[in-house]
Amino acid sequence: MKSKQPQPDGQSYRTAILRYAERDQAMRQQYLVGGGAWDASLDADSTDFLRTTVAAIGWPTIRMVGSEASTAAWLLLQHSPDIDFMEHCLELMKAAPRGEVALRDIAFLEDRVCLLRGRPQIYGSQFQGRGKTLRLYPVEDAERLDERRAAMGLPPFAEYEKQIRQMYGDEPPAAR
């Protein structure tokens, strides 16, 4: 009789997800500030890991792996080169019980998927460029943007834009 290998528990997945996210962020940080090499294979490797994880346990929810690791899984997914997998995970995230996936993570991923599919974003989370060239990608129904953002627990767009412009070296026009 063959013995079955025990399934890893949430803590095992949490540890692995956080390790992959740490690698992801270290590479990006070195690239941005230190002129390190961009390693696209890291995103592919992280996607393979996440694909295996999702096949085994579904989307890594807050209850299963904790808030930090659930958001770290989202971060890895944001950097995935596989848009179909991103869309699949977005549906899993939306289907999770309320409070099991951060609404912010869902909103940002939905905007990323819209952008990659050539559609206007819904929550206004995605910008392009840096400094004076920083601009918001097109947004669907801009008049109701803050209403949609509030429903996902996001700050008003003007506040978010100011934060983004401060991070990337440019103040919004009203602050000049």
Regions found by a protein language model. Give the residues of each.
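N-terminal helix-rich structural modules
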Residues: M1-G118, I122
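Amphipathic alpha-helical packing elements
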Residues: R112, Y123, K132-G169
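Extended hydrophobic packing segments that form well-structured cores
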Residues: Y168, P173-R176
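Expand to "…catalyze enediolate/carbanion chemistry for C-C bond making/breaking, isomerization
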Residues: F127
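Generic low-complexity segments that are intrinsically disordered, proline-rich and/or Lys/Arg-biased
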Residues: Q7-D9, V139, F157, P173-A174
